[in-house]
Amino acid sequence: MEEEKNWIVVPTWRIPGRLEKWHSLIKHLKYNTKDLQKACYVPHHKVGWAWWTCSRVIFPLKDEAHLEVQGYWNLTPEKGWLSTYAVRITWYSRNFWTDVTPDYADTLLHGTYFPCFSEGEVRRAIRGEKLLSCCKFPKAHKNQVPSLQYLALTVVSHVRSQGENPTWKQWRRNNRRGLRLARQNSRRNKQGSSESFAEGTNFPGLAKVLGILA
């Protein structure tokens, strides 16, 4: 009697390439800039029996919760013989877990990681003083209804950093800068270079870094 074949079905986000860029950025933000110092990076040779998993990145969150980004390889492609890569993004709490979208994962991450505007910045902006903080993860606010304070502080910080009113092209260029530098850092690591990811850039968000095909 033939043994019945069992399938494991989970929601995943397909990516167009390999995961070196993602691994490189996580290790840089964990060990160099310390922005993700609490995160745990688990490479494929330490995952254990889950041979289809090429890496796990675990982000501890508030209230004993955590976010896990699990990379898969050797998945069956739609056409051809080449392996397909994908990621699964899961949020865990004490009594519940669920898969989440990359946009919502960004919101969860920003609640614990990467600084944002402090409460006193509104008063400093009104008095015309120098802002002492800024948002390093603006992509996390994409699917939220931004407050007037956040919108005003975002405009003020851009205007003062550029010395003039920013155009829409400049705004898009700034948002893409973090992703471009992540790619450059990945190529440097492949070539054995010791140059690191540039400091002071914004985190571009999970979807951008992973190249998810939504």
Swiss-Prot record:
BP terms from Gene Ontology: viral life cycle
Membrane topology, from the record: Peripheral membrane protein
Location in the cell: Host cytoplasm; Host cell membrane; Virion
Entry's induction text: Expressed late during infection in a Rev-dependent manner.
GO cellular component: host cell cytoplasm; host cell plasma membrane; membrane; virion component
Protein modification: Processed in virion by the viral protease. Highly phosphorylated on serine and threonine residues.
Motif extent (BC-box-like motif): 147-156
Pfam families: Vif
Chain positions found as Phosphothreonine: T98
Cited InterPro entries: Vif
Residues where Phosphoserine is found: S147
Stretches the record annotates as Multimerization: 154-166
Alphabetized UniProt keyword annotations: Host cell membrane, Host cytoplasm, Host membrane, Host-virus interaction, Membrane, Phosphoprotein, Ubl conjugation, Ubl conjugation pathway, Virion
Motif position, HCCH motif: 110-141
Family: Belongs to the primate lentivirus group Vif protein family.
Additional free-text comment from the UniProt record: Vif-defective viruses show catastrophic failure in reverse transcription due to APOBEC-induced mutations that initiate a DNA base repair pathway and compromise the structural integrity of the ssDNA. In the absence of Vif, the virion is morphologically abnormal.
Function recorded in the entry: Counteracts the innate antiviral activity of APOBEC3G. Forms a complex with host APOBEC3G thus preventing the entry of this lethally hypermutating enzyme into progeny virions. Functions as an adapter molecule, recruiting APOBEC3G to the ubiquitin-proteasome machinery. Targets APOBEC3G for degradation through the assembly with elongin BC complex, CUL5 and RBX1. Binds viral RNA and affects the stability of viral nucleoprotein core. May play a role in viral morphology.
Record's comment describing the protein's domains: The BC-like-box motif mediates the interaction with elongin BC complex. The HCCH motif (H-x(5)-C-x(18)-C-x(5)-H) mediates the interaction with CUL5.
Self-association and partners: Homomultimer; in vitro and presumably in vivo. Interacts with viral Pr55Gag precursor and host APOBEC3G. The interaction between Vif and APOBEC3G is species-specific, which may play a role in restricting the replication of SIV to their host. Forms an E3 ligase complex by interacting with host CUL5 and elongin BC complex (ELOB and ELOC).
Protein name: Virion infectivity factor
Protein's organism: Simian immunodeficiency virus (isolate PBj14/BCL-3)
Gene name for this UniProt entry: vif
